[in-house]
Amino acid sequence: MNAPDIRKYLNQESIDSDPAETAEWNEAFMDLLASGDSERAKFILDNLVKLANKSQINWVPDLVTPYINTIPVDEQPEFPGDLAIEEKLASLMRWNALAMVARANEAYGELGGHIASYASAADLFEVGFNHFFRARIENNDPKDRGDLVFFQPHSAPGVYARAYLEGRLTDNDLAHYRREITAPEAGAKGLSSYPHPWLMPDFWQFPTGSMGIGPISSIYHARFMRYLTDRKLLDCTTRKVWGVFGDGEMDEPESMSALTLASREKLDNLVWVVNCNLQRLDGPVRGNGRIIDELEKLFRGSGWNVIKLVWGSDWDGLFARDTTGALVKAFAQTVDGQMQTFAAKDGSFNRKNFFGQNEELARLAQGMTDEQIDRLKRGGHDLVKIYAAYHAAANHIGQPTVILAHTKKGYGMGNAGQGKMTTHSQKKLDDEALIEYRNRFNLPLTDEQAKSLKFFKPEESGPELKYLKEQRIKLGGQLPRRYSACEKISVPDIQSYAAFAIKAEEKEMSTTMAFVRMLGNLLKDKGLGAKVVPIVADEARTFGMANLFKQVGIYSSVGQRYEPEDIGSVLSYREALDGQILEEGISEAGAIASWTAAATSYSVHGIAMLPFYIYYSMFGFQRIGDAIWAAADQRARGFLLGATSGRT
């Protein structure tokens, strides 16, 4: 293994009081790297950090790495697919998604929809669909129940576009985008604006339209899969949870609030792909900063494995020729607002304003045409780089992984939308823009077909559709797809768990006490008991549920590594690997996310669970109303109980 020249990645803004000594340190470390023993190099660095901390020099290592790809070229795995066909398919998806939204808004201007989001995310979706997202296989093997995929909601048109090429949707269905009520009259399926299981119960699994709900839900679903495995109810060890979310969405408190739970539980079955197109509806996500660097620091500090996917393969040659670190230094001085401007402008502008900053950069661009500069891809648009990132994430052990993918919002929309401030709200394109889009992606459409927004589908016997379907067969079948059938569980007779309440004989009893007694009896039932999931948010003692700690235990992925202070008590605080109670701490959002994961288990995992989430009434709908709505959208089955309200 050749040692990389790390000198060009060093902070060139720092003042070096002794360059000769610095050179000696650099040389020693580079010699260590040259030996090929990366583990030894990591040990030395860790040891130096410990030494610095002991010396109390008030130094903390920077959690932000250079603005380049985490995975170097020489560590990229070989791309396993047909690159030309996959690029063509991604172009077709983009076109049909655009045509769907634009046609809907030409017919009814108030329908709305989004073009630019999927234009930026198409390649991220396609690599997942072609190589990683495993569908559920109809057999008795629990390991074949597929991956869970949370889709960026504004990119829903792209998922419909893929389902169209797969033959799951028709031209007529696409023509009724966002027209669920009138579609049946025309013999079509109405396509919901965002992923809505309630409206499309055989298609969408998870509602992600409300920003932040998807991210936190994906974390608690991944943790619930571990819960099922550890309690030996269902083996989920081979399955993954994938989430494709937006960089703007990361500002939602729900997006960030459970990051440490994911790392604490070592959820290496969880992969997030954050589509960093740098723009939200009104403008830049971080115009005066860099959202990728900010998120890297946040996720790394929360204990996640972070993969930066910043630049495409077109940049590899430039980096190889850059012996002075000019590119890395220029990126470090370029904020997202300016990067958005570069996305919106052409190659001539970028040659002058990026590569023209100094002689070193200018030399790197020598010999490149303006068109070649314009076509320099960001990492999230390069299938080879995306595959490398996904492959590394899928094989990482011991941590959840986030891939920070750099893209252009409205990718390929040219002057009509690429990188424009208003692109999120773009619903229509004029004739000139449509023809430009067709040319940009080399689509087999005539001028008239492009202007009329004709949906395009290759011949069934052609290589494109054959390849698309073969790739999905390898991964288990079509996706997304929602299931509703599951094993039936016998419900115990009411006398077996509630006789004390039915025959109360005028004894006074609070409703909370009655519930807790019923719950305790249900947990003892031989048929249903193991499927009951009690959930609390640090309120069990208030509700008189502490006796359940010892009876069924509190779930902990590491068991109990300490002796509880009250070990001799009948109410002793007992944590266990096979514990049944989900104690979520002071997090109503986490508790409802766990409840939803359990309440939809019949559909997601094919195993019916019965969750009870009991909470202070005043912290109920006021705090988690949106999450309850999302649970209803995905047809959750369980019990929510508003208990004590007021003085506690």
Task: Locate predicted features.
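Non-catalytic terminal/interface segments that mediate subunit docking, oligomerization
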Residues: 76-97, 118, 136, 141, ...
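Cofactor-binding active-site loop characterized by glycine-rich and histidine/acidic residues
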Residues: 76-93, 97-107, 114-265, 288-289, ...
